From Swiss-Prot:
Heme binds at residue 472. It is a single-pass membrane protein. The lineage of its organism: Eukaryota, Fungi, Dikarya, Ascomycota, Saccharomycotina. This is Cytochrome P450 52A6. It is found in: Membrane. CDD domains: CYP52. The gene is CYP52A6. The keyword Heme applies. Keywords: Heme, Iron, Membrane, Metal-binding, Monooxygenase, Oxidoreductase, Transmembrane, Transmembrane helix. Its main location: membrane. The keyword Protein biosynthesis does not apply. Induction: By various alkanes.
Amino acid sequence: MATQEIIDSALPYLTKWYTVITLAALVFLISSNIKNYVKAKKLKCRDPPYFKGAGWTGISPLIEIIKVKGNGRLARFWPIKTFDDYPNHTFYMSIIGALKIVLTVIQENIKAVLATQFTDFSLGTRHAHFYPLLGDGIFTLDGEGWKHSRAMLRPQFARDQIGHVKALEPHIQILAKQIKLNKGKTFDIQELFFRFTVDTATEFLFGESVHSLYDEKLGIPTPNEIPGRDNFATAFNTSQHYLATRTYSQTFYFLTNPKEFRDCNAKVHYLAKYFVNKALNFTPEEIEEKSKSGYVFLYELVKQTRDPKVLQDQLLNIMVAGRDTTAGLLSFAMFELARHPEIWSKLREEIEVNFGVGEESRVEEITFESLKRCEYLKAILNETLRMYPSVPVNSRTATRDTTLPRGGGPNGTDPIFIPKGSTVAYIVYKTHRLEEYYGKDADDFRPERWFEPSTKKLGWAYVPFNGGPRICLGQQFALTEASYVITRLVQMFETVSSPPDVEYPPPKCIHLTMSHDDGVFVKM
């Protein structure tokens, strides 16, 4: 066939709009990759190894992640040991050659993303992922919006606010009643912890608890009737499930927006609006009077702004951060304590010395300050957060062309070029289990390691609460609440044990935070 004939036969297809768009995209993609290659060479950067399971499109791992995410089995699917197959535990994948995703676990890169090169990265599409539930809050905003949110919220986590552990005691009493209903039986304590933390969080944030721990089994009437109370906890959980799926979908988040998600968001917003409107109807004098009986997050925010949307969004942002993370920490701590009676006994000795146990418990002596004396308790919580960080996977998006210090090249020692728009995912779960940071027993639950000199030099190899400018404002709040709860349980219950056939390592479920996939079954 003559050249002219070939051109004539191809011309109708070449002029079609979809062909033109495809060719233009291909030209743009090739030119962008060439430019990035030249920039990387100038900066003496080299790519890390390409993820073997990604294929040339890079889409198959994302599809598989979304699929198993729907079954709540993401942590079981993602092979954490995969990082050991690559130099410096770093590799990358590319979505159709356009979107670069670097996955890393080493502390030098985590430090760069979160601190030393903080301004080079943003939350990327997180705002779009989370907006339907959380709106514009501290965990969804970047830039000036984030700075304003942080300045508004920082005073709310001052020592005077987080130190009031006495507000937890009424909820502890109900939790203990629920546990005692299962005396001599194996039961799921994680389910109780999640109900407990939604009760304490709503009281701290809204001024009234939703009392989800109250049920017909206790035979105790709910102290107050709140519109939407019964649906709140379930709706909140379901909404977070969909938020996580949207997050793992990256730029395809908009495909996850079913009616159930929208309905659950509406139920959560209904309750939040109820409390916000109630607070806004109080006079400044009434707010001051109510604040005298105990600290309430919402009442303090009302003194700074009377914008109902700002109040609702910030409250729900803090709710997401404060409720599930603490419940997960408590659940995994009890899971390990039930497996290690020797650790429980040693902890009970420390609690007995400081606060008494059983009928000789001196509950009134448990304060924010006195809990700091319990060094072994602190070590147990540190070890729990090491092995089971609340947010095991996180990511940032490059706002400009930048670099990561290590992970590139065949030996993983070269810097990596990160083009603008690329994603850097850092997997803290794996960081906390690297032998080079924690030794040969990195996969073992051993609180004693926190009394060893090596753990004083961990730096960015231990980041359960993130780090840098966006370090978690509520970390001390969460640790104080967890410390108080465990101390009181140790005082009230002599032993805790787990079934002999309990699965280990435990199956983990990742939504926005990590929890035990099958529940934490113990006997107390």
